[in-house]
């Protein structure tokens, strides 16, 4: 838990965030005086990329070693998914979900209710034994769907591990985003693990990245980036000739490439997530 006392460098894509009065998380350079919870990795990035100064209020630290087994597991799953994607095997989506659960399960919030299904014959007896914990019930056909309050007293998670995973994933993005800004390369949109930038600058950024970090930016391995557009029939580079961004995870790219005969082909890359239905 820290209090930010100084921000030395403002960024187009700020690293730290605060919650507004309405509960919306806002990434901002205007965080002087803000009190926030932060882990070691995110704090190092805030110092390195935005030159922040801070006061430590309180916190936890671990000094008895570090279990890195997850590194081997994620490497195995990544290699397996890469192989399945090459074979166009839809099972790769299952591996993707398993990989996502590496952090999702560690920061799982308490599950406050559970749904129990009972037949008409079982319903009255179940209610009589569990009435103190019944939140609601609804009859569907010949069965009852009962929402039961679940005790959270036994709930636990590994939030300190999940935070570390998320912060390392953000560092991968932070290294690229801040380097692009420092080299006056335009990043038009950023998501969790991707970004939109000018096609002619795609070759410039990797060179600067290798010079600074002594690693390859472009490739198909973990922590590397590559052009990720898909267009049926494309035999050349795929790029967007026009894009419209409405909000986070709400955008469309007009894609263009050439087919095997050299003819220009086009298609759409559309994302529309987190839009309320009412």
What are these regions (language model features)?
Residues 1-278:
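Conserved acidic
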